[in-house]
Amino acid sequence: MKQQTKRLLKSLCMAVGIILLSAVDPLAGYAAERTIDIKHLGEGQSIVRVDARAKYLLLPVEESSPESKLYMIVDNDVVRTFNVRLAVNKVDYFVPVDLSGYADKHISFNFQLAPESALCWKEMKLSDQFDSSNREKFRPAYHFSPAWGWMNDPNGMVYKDGEYHLFYQYNPYGSMWGNMHWGHAISKDLIHWEHQPVAIAPDALGTIFSGSCVVDKDNTAGFGAGAIVAFYTSASDRQVQSMAYSLDNGRTFKKYDRNPILTSTQRDFRDPKVFWHKESNKWIMVLAVGQEMQLYSSPNLKDWT
């Protein structure tokens, strides 16, 4: 009888121990707490609140669907605006929205032009990983391509401290033209390329069209000797020229706080190519303006005439 009592008490203690361990397990219930809260407002508009502890929000895409506009809102401020062809009837693939820079903040998305009946609401998910492995039969292996998304014009190719920098027109939210960013990759031999985070993203002035980069070795702009300075077209209803600079060999860029640096009444006003002209001791910018090319000069990369 005593032996049976001891065995019963031992079993009870083990059971209680297991329950207690489950209660204090730091991962227990974590996945369940990573929620996506969807509120449909009618007329194609929805508010989606997400858990900021996840690294990515994965959006389901259907190539044949019309574009929906998304506003990413962090602590009540719009930090990003982009268009996505959200899945309505089927999922062709997923694209990631990076949430990693907003830990401990309140993140929501304002979806516009996305019907309540669309499949996307059931398929979107939070994840700490995004598999961008190249499994496509006809995807180039030798020629550069982004890890995912769409690219075209190479921009701002520059060499500094043993590294070649390739920037390019990039849509990280689909496989068609749109949402223009500057993508970025680095190589030491022009053959093997290492993908980098987006270098320059759209802002209130517009999306990021083509341009060029220079290395300001003499610090003419005052950003710092050896700064990589990028010039690009900010494109919205009108096109203006803007500038950003990097002090860490292109790993991050800071936009010039007095953008735009050059404006025009011409609707087509884009694609700045900047270089140093030794004879005049000035920087020269070549711009496509309407149906002609125009030349501008500057002593400091900021003030152009």
Labelled PLM ranges:
Residues C13-D25:
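Bacterial N-terminal signal peptides
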Residues D25-A31:
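Sec-dependent signal peptide cleavage junction
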